[in-house]
Amino acid sequence: MKRHRPVSSSESSDECPSTSFTSSSMYRKKSKNPKEQKKSAEVFRKDLISAMKIPDSHHVNPDSYYLFTDTWKEEWEKGVQVPANPDSVPTPSLRIISEKVKEMLFVRPRKYIRCSSPESAEPGYINTLEQAASTCRYDLDDMDIFWLQELNEDLGEMGYGPIDETLMEKTIEVLERHCHENMNHAIETVEGLGIEYDEDVICDVCRSPDSEEGNDMVFCDKCNVCVHQACYGILKIPEGSWLCRSCVLGIYPQCVLCPKKGGAMKTTRTGTKWAHVSCALWIPEVSIACPERMEPVTKISHIPPSRWALVCNLCKLKTGACIQCSVKSCITAFHVTCAFEHGLEMKTILDEGDEVKFKSFCLKHSQNKPKLGDAEYHHHRVAEQSQAKSEKTSLRAQKLRELEEEFYTLVQVEDVAKEMELSAFTVDFIYNYWKLKRKSNFNKPLIPPKEEEENGLVQPKEESIHTRMRMFMHLRQDLERVRNLCYMISRREKLKLSHTKVQEQIFGLQVQLINEEITEGLSLTNALENSLFYPPPRITLKLKMPKSTSEDCKDSSTETEHQLSSPGSSSPGHSKRSPQMPEEPLDMNVKIYPRYPLESKSNCLQTSRSHSRCETKSSSPTPRAPSAEFYHGQSLGKPLALQAALHGQVSIGNGKNQPNSRVSSSNGLEGNWSGNITQKVNSSEVCYDQESMLSSHLPSPGNIRKSSMEHFSRSFKEATNTWVKPTEDLQYCVKPTKNVSSKEQLWGRQLLRRPTGRASYQETDGYCPDLEPSDSEAEGEGSKETPRVKRESSDRENPSHDSARECHGKTKTHPHSHSSMQR
């Protein structure tokens, strides 16, 4: 049936017919097979929406319709989905299926199977907790057992059953527990002590004794502080006992704004600091966050340092923050709690704008100040407070003593009988016996109370917290020490590593320099480089000499002694400065090395000058005897083996002087001192040339054993080869001096013929291992002198015959090398 739809303001509704049954297949995809099409179960009806619409021209009460302002209006025009055939709606059918029970095989549990009965299934198992809870804390003594036997006899005569010992112990324990609990409750509450509070008691915050409905005065059951509900922020008075904030936590804190403890206190936001509510109200910088609950205390950090520095005029303490007198000309400072205790005038003024102003006055400006003086009033006030406190304490102690004496009034027999499931008649006998026994023990309990009942639960928790804090603090200190030790150890190891690296670099540079000098053939003259190598060991040779050799060498040793002693006696000024040469290996080439000290160069020159005065010269090359000073100068610069060989040739010669020997003069050399060769080359090469000249002029005796000196020949040949070459080069540069005056020849002969009466010259700088004082001693009279040669020194200082012959042959072609060497 179609209904006429009134005109609607909707454009989309006018275009559509009023009622249309549209199949839901229009909004679905058509089936591929037309035979499979089924009738739709739902249709979209638009007449329901159109019937609800009201035209704009229709006047209707505004309360009877709703204005449709949704922008989703076009979607409403599509219609409402309704079933096509409501009569053919299928009815659901259901059936209940029983749950299938899962079958599981038995699996042995890891733990033992325990029975729920109190008796243990296994004889070895014991539950310690249950056993401790079931164990009675009271043990019967002999008096209790005797009284129990008498009671059982009386109960048997009266027709009651007997009481065993375990039952009596448990009954006495229950009586003690009830007495302890009721006594603690009586001590904590006002009713138990029976203290009647005075009517003139005042609030600890506002100091007002008045109370009104909804703002009653509340007392703390532990510290007995009195506060108004509004002053302390108590929204609802709890039933039973009430404790203040500090008593709830079981602490007795110190106020941060004054030196007093106790009273109506609240915490800061952190909960670590406490302050009196009165102090927070009277100090202008401090405020309270929530006025309804009067907590927490805030803005303590806003107090200026000048207020913290004030000293209280009443308690004379510089603790906390003080307030000052409201009189502008007065600057007297005092604590808020000190002002309350001394009865100063503290006014609270309410302005018209509901603003509260606090006015405080000192002793001088207070209107209700006492007539007594300040000192007298202070002593009087202290006396009154101490008296009131003592009276209050004595009253409380008296009430406690009365409560302890009347302990039996705190226990009800009916409650004990109900808990023990016994008759009141039987429990009454045990109750009377317990009362008599406790009175005989000065009203002390028969069993000690438990630690939880004696100390409470709050205080041990607080102590445990402080203990843990101390433990963590000590742990942090220990960890800090460990960290410091680890840092110091790491720093020490780093320093050691850097030091080792520096030493390694130094060693590497030293080795590099030594390798460079070795490859270039330079001498190791640096003290730091020489410290890396130790000097070669000293070699001492003991040779056996035949008697004929010592006899043949008399003349030679005599002449040698003359030559050795003549420089020391003729030139004493020169003997003070003996040349010192650095150590050199045998195979070192003769080169100008810049590291030689200047002193050694000059000493070599002086040695060459003094040596030229004592040498003889002829046209043919003949062996010459060197001076003792030359050996002393070279003893420190040659190896020990070479020194022994050269020194032996001096000590043991052929015993003959050349007939044509002449004393050389140095005048010609001094005249030609500024020749073609520079002073630096002269001073560095003269010392090497002297040794080469010595080796060429030394005769070699044929009666020395070859077997003892064979190992010296090879090294001596190499040294001679290297020393002869610079001598040849110097031969072409310097001309020898042949003109010698007759006066100088005569002076030289006198020196040769002069007998030596003392030992040979020795250096005063130190010990010389190459020349012994007994090597050149002479004994005799007149021109004939018999030398005394030690066997040990002669054996040590004789070179081989072959080496001396070869050296003499090589140096034979250079007759003027010695004179050129003196430059």
UniProtKB/Swiss-Prot annotation:
Residues that span the membrane, as ranges: none
One GO BP: regulation of DNA biosynthetic process
Modified residues (N6-acetyllysine): K30, K32, K35, K601, K638, K735
Keyword Phosphoprotein annotated: yes
Any one annotated GO CC term: histone acetyltransferase complex
InterPro entries documented for this protein: Enhancer_polycomb-like_N, EPHD, Histone_Mod_Regulator, JADE3_PHD, Zinc_finger_PHD-type_CS, Znf_FYVE_PHD, Znf_PHD, Znf_PHD-finger
Keyword presence, Glycosyltransferase: no
Family annotation (Pfam families): EPL1, PHD_2, zf-HC5HC2H_2
Zn-finger (C2HC pre-PHD-type) residues: 252-286
Zinc finger (PHD-type): 200-250, 310-366
Low complexity composition-biased segments: 8-20
Cross-referenced CDD domains: PHD_JADE3 (cd15681)
Annotated coiled-coil segments of the chain: none
Keywords: Acetylation, Metal-binding, Phosphoprotein, Repeat, Zinc, Zinc-finger
One GO MF term: zinc ion binding
Biased composition (Basic and acidic residues): 549-562, 781-809
Residue span of region Disordered: 1-40, 543-585, 601-631, 651-676, 756-823
Modified residue annotations for Phosphoserine: S566, S578, S608, S774, S776
Highest taxon above the source species: Eukaryota
PANTHER family: PHD FINGER PROTEINS (PTHR13793), PROTEIN JADE-3 (PTHR13793:SF27)
Role played: Scaffold subunit of some HBO1 complexes, which have a histone H4 acetyltransferase activity.
UniProt similarity note: Belongs to the JADE family.
Subunit organization: Component of the HBO1 complex composed at least of ING4 or ING5, MYST2/HBO1, MEAF6, and one of JADE1, JADE2 and JADE3.
Protein name, as recorded: Protein Jade-3
Organism whose genome encodes this protein: Mus musculus
This protein's encoding gene: Jade3
